[in-house]
Amino acid sequence: MAYAYLFKYIIIGDTGVGKSCLLLQFTDKRFQPVHDLTIGVEFGARMITIDGKQIKLQIWDTAGQESFRSITRSYYRGAAGALLVYDITRRDTFNHLTTWLEDARQHSNSNMVIMLIGNKSDLESRREVKKEEGEAFAREHGLIFMETSAKTASNVEEAFINTAKEIYEKIQEGVFDINNEANGIKIGPQHGATNATHAGNQGGQQAGGGCC
């Protein structure tokens, strides 16, 4: 289907925080509780609508293991948006955010939009990281912040779409050079069209994989 823009995303964070589950919930609207670990990088895509324009999201789901970190780094370079995910029930995944963020900012373009996601909000009784802590980290580092549940789908749609809205606003403001695909943005065949059909509910294809 024709689109006005293509935005490339990367999903990063420790193993087991639910990165693959978030992607699967967004692209296929389903939750798969048992997964193999993601090996290297997997891929998903979906069309959304922003400001009457079709936007294709091309989403790269990365492995959280240290042994795959060099592979992950190579995907930062062509990303317009990053979803940095931690698990609200595991304090260590929150403590590692600074390392992930430093890595992302070192290897990406300076305008990349980063959404901080506290996942597994359905497991409130096992919470180790307060929502206020996530909000404070996001404020300190200039990130967008949301808590999500890949299991119940709470805020999953919003996390992906709000990231896209932020990228779109930066395009309108002239922050992104849309002629440079290294910024993670590609102009599509529908660019400039005024009458876009709504495809916000259209799913994409996601390779099978782990919730890592």
From Swiss-Prot:
N-acetylalanine found at: A2
GO cellular component labels: acrosomal vesicle; autophagosome membrane; endoplasmic reticulum membrane; endoplasmic reticulum-Golgi intermediate compartment membrane; Golgi membrane; melanosome
Tissue specificity remark: Brain and parietal cells.
Primary location: endoplasmic reticulum
Record keywords: Acetylation, Cytoplasmic vesicle, Endoplasmic reticulum, ER-Golgi transport, Golgi apparatus, GTP-binding, Hydrolase, Lipoprotein, Magnesium, Membrane, Metal-binding, Nucleotide-binding, Prenylation, Protein transport, Transport
Gene Ontology terms: biological process: autophagosome-lysosome fusion; Golgi organization; macroautophagy; protein transport
Motif (Switch 2): 63-72
EC numbers on record: 3.6.5.2
InterPro entries: P-loop_NTPase, Rab_GTPases_membrane_traffic, Small_GTP-bd, Small_GTPase
Regulation: Regulated by guanine nucleotide exchange factors (GEFs) which promote the exchange of bound GDP for free GTP, GTPase activating proteins (GAPs) which increase the GTP hydrolysis activity, and GDP dissociation inhibitors (GDIs) which inhibit the dissociation of the nucleotide from the GTPase.
Compartments in which it is found: Endoplasmic reticulum-Golgi intermediate compartment membrane; Melanosome; Endoplasmic reticulum membrane; Golgi apparatus membrane
List of residues binding GTP: G16, V17, G18, K19, S20, C21, T38, G64, N119, K120, D122, A150, K151
GO molecular function ontology, one term from the record: GTP binding
Cofactor(s) essential for the protein: Mg(2+)
Enzyme class: hydrolase
Family: Belongs to the small GTPase superfamily. Rab family.
Subunit structure: Interacts with PRKCI. Interacts with TRIP11. Interacts (in GTP-bound form) with GARIN1B. Interacts (GTP-bound) with HOPS complex component VPS39; interaction contributes to obtaining a functional HOPS complex that promotes autophagosome-lysosome membrane fusion driven by STX17-SNAP29-VAMP8. May interact with VPS41.
Protein name per UniProt: Ras-related protein Rab-2A
Species of provenance: Oryctolagus cuniculus (Rabbit)
Lineage: Eukaryota, Metazoa, Chordata, Craniata, Vertebrata
